[in-house]
Amino acid sequence: MPRGILVMLDVVVQAQQLEKVTAALEKLPEVVDLHEVTGEYDLVALLQTDSIVEFRRLTHKIQRIEGIKGTNSMVIIHTLKKDGKSVAE
């Protein structure tokens, strides 16, 4: 299991800015996974940081990326299944 803070970050992108925002997010080492999705949000990212303080700094940095209209974050408190397998405690 990874150490630190894991966060699912939903991202709303301004029209015509998806490629630019995606490129900026891909450059951040804390962005572990990045998915383009349907629905209310345009992108979903999995973030991994060492601490909640680092997560706060990262979200402020992400929110300043040109083309990002808004974000919603969910801190992962417990993983039940990963890579198709149950995770035993």
Predicted regions located by residue number:
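A compositional/biophysical signature of low hydrophobicity enriched in polar/charged and small residues
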Residues: M1-E89
